Design a protein with these regions (language model features):
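Terminal, non-globular segments
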Residues: 214-218
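A structural motif corresponding to the C-terminal lobe/cap of the Radical SAM core domain
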Residues: 205-209
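Conserved AdoMet/S-adenosylmethionine-binding subsite of the radical SAM
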Residues: 56-68, 77-204
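Non-heme iron-sulfur electron-transfer modules
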Residues: 41-56
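Conserved strand-to-loop "acid loop" that flanks and positions the catalytic carboxylate
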Residues: 74
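N-terminal [4Fe-4S]-dependent radical SAM core
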Residues: 1-23, 32-44, 61-65
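Hydrophobic packing within well-folded, soluble alpha/beta domains
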Residues: 27, 31-34, 89, 98
C-alpha cells in the first residue's frame, strides 16, 4: 500500500469508535477547495511515505484498545492493494471505515461483497450536474450514482458528506444536493477551510473577506 499518513489514535473520524486513521496517497479528483494537496499525486514523497509494516505493528500492539481503523486519502479505491490491506486489518479483529469519493463502484462492490468494510463514508461533492466544477475533472457521474446505490443497499453503516463551498455552490445547489441523499441515510455538512484550498483564488477570496471584517476594539 502506498501510505502517506498514519494517526494512531482518533476520537472523531469513526463515529462512536476510538480509531486509528490511515491515509493513502493519490486522488483522481482535483477539487479546487481540497485542503490535502500533498495527498493528490499518485507518486508519494519517499521522505514522507509511511511504511505499511510499521503501521501494522502499531495496530497489532493496540488492537485491543481500538474500535476500528479509518482508511482515507487521497482516494483509497485507487490502490490496487486495498483489498489485501483491509484483509490484514480484519485479521486483527478491527472494524474498517472507508472514506471514498465513490468514483470506483467496481472496487467498492468487491469490498462490500467480501465484507471488508463495516462503515462507508462517501463524499457527495455537488448536485450531479455540477460535479465537474466541484471535482476539477470531467468525472463519470454515473459511477458515483452506482456507488451510492451500492452503499445504500449493502446493509453496511454509512454516511454521505458534503463540504459547503459557498463561493462555488449556492443555496439552491445545496437544496438540490440534499434531494440526492437517499431517504434514511445520514448526511453531514463539513466545514470549508479556504486557507488551505488548492485554488489560489479561493484562498485569496478568504483572505480578502477576513481583511474586510471589522476588528473588535482592543
Amino acid at each position: 500500500m502506498n501510505l502517506a499518513g498514519f494517526v494512531p489514535l482518533s476520537l472523531c473520524d469513526y463515529p462512536g469508535r476510538v480509531a486509528a486513521v490511515v491515509f493513502t496517497q493519490g486522488c483522481n479528483f482535483r477539487c479546487p477547495w481540497c485542503h490535502n494537496g500533498h495527498l493528490l499525486p499518485m507518486a508519494s514523497d519517499p521522505a514522507t511515505r509511511v511504511d505499511e509494516a510499521r503501521v501494522m505493528a502499531v495496530l497489532s500492539e493496540r488492537c485491543t484498545r481500538l474500535g476500528g481503523v479509518v482508511v482515507t486519502g487521497g482516494e483509497p479505491t485507487l490502490q490496487a492493494d486495498l483489498p489485501r490491506f483491509l484483509k490484514r486489518l480484519k485479521t486483527l479483529g478491527l472494524d474498517v471505515k472507508l472514506d471514498t469519493n465513490g468514483s470506483h463502484p467496481d472496487v467498492l462492490r468487491r469490498l462490500l461483497q467480501e465484507r471488508l468494510v463495516d462503515y462507508v463514508a462517501m463524499d457527495m461533492k455537488a448536485p450531479w450536474d455540477k460535479y465537474a466544477t466541484l471535482t476539477g475533472v470531467a468525472c463519470d457521474v454515473a459511477a458515483m450514482q452506482a456507488s451510492l446505490r451500492l452503499i445504500v443497499t449493502s446493509g453496511v453503516s454509512h454516511a454521505f458528506r458534503t463540504t459547503r463551498v459557498d463561493p462555488l455552490l449556492s443555496a439552491q445547489d445545496y437544496a438540490r444536493l440534499a434531494d440526492q441523499v437517499p431517504e434514511g441515510s445520514l448526511h453531514t455538512w463539513q466545514l470549508f477551510r479556504p486557507a488551505y484550498s488548492q485554488d489560489p483564488a479561493l484562498r485569496a477570496a478568504a483572505a480578502l473577506a477576513g481583511a474586510s471584517q471589522p476588528h473588535a476594539p482592543a
